[in-house]
């Protein structure tokens, strides 16, 4: 079985994340969308909330599993029997950081590949940080996140449609 791991904080999941999922799901028999537990970040949504949101927006994909992990992504991927880690790239600046991570992962796990997918142009400006900033000023999240995610963000920030 070909297993891929798409790790991230997904705080919140964006249309850019969804684009990468939708394009990578067919590359593997099973795709694990792995929510990182990062104690150093102050998340908008708890890990449990992010898992619930992801399960909701990804329910139409029978070969996707949503899970959580802490520690090194490469260790988690190996524990899951993955053949690859999936990463999305928005800009050259993303590649620079991802390149270092991929080289480190290759050193730690020589048989584990890193698969990069370029985010579609219409999503290249979207990041979870940008979404949270727009939401903090009660701006429209249309086109940035799935509708159910927009509603949950608006609930967190105390404003409606």
Curated annotation (Swiss-Prot):
One of its GO terms (cellular component) is cytoplasm. It is an enzyme of class 2 (transferase). It comes from Desulforamulus reducens (strain ATCC BAA-1160 / DSM 100696 / MI-1). The keyword Magnesium applies. This is Phosphopantetheine adenylyltransferase. GO terms for molecular function: ATP binding; pantetheine-phosphate adenylyltransferase activity. Homohexamer. It catalyses: (R)-4'-phosphopantetheine + ATP + H(+) = 3'-dephospho-CoA + diphosphate.
């Amino acid at each position: 079985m070909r297993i891929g791991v798409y790790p991230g904080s997904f705080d919140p999941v964006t249309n850019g994340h969804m684009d990468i999922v939708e394009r990578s799901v067919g590359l593997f028999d099973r795709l694990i969308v792995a929510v990182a537990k990062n104690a150093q970040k102050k998340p908008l949504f708890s890990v449990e909330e992010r898992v619930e949101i992801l399960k909701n927006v990804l329910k139409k994909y029978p070969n996707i599993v949503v899970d959580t992990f802490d520690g090194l992504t490469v260790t988690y991927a190996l524990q899951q029997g993955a053949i690859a880690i999936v990463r999305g790239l928005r800009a050259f600046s993303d590649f620079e950081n991802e390149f270092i991570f991929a080289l480190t992962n290759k050193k730690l796990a020589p048989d584990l590949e890193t698969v990069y997918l370029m985010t579609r142009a219409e999503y290249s400006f979207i990041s979870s940080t940008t979404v949270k900033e727009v939401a903090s000023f009660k701006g429209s999240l249309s086109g940035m996140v799935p509708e159910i995610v927009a509603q949950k963000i608006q609930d967190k920030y105390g404003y409606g449609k």
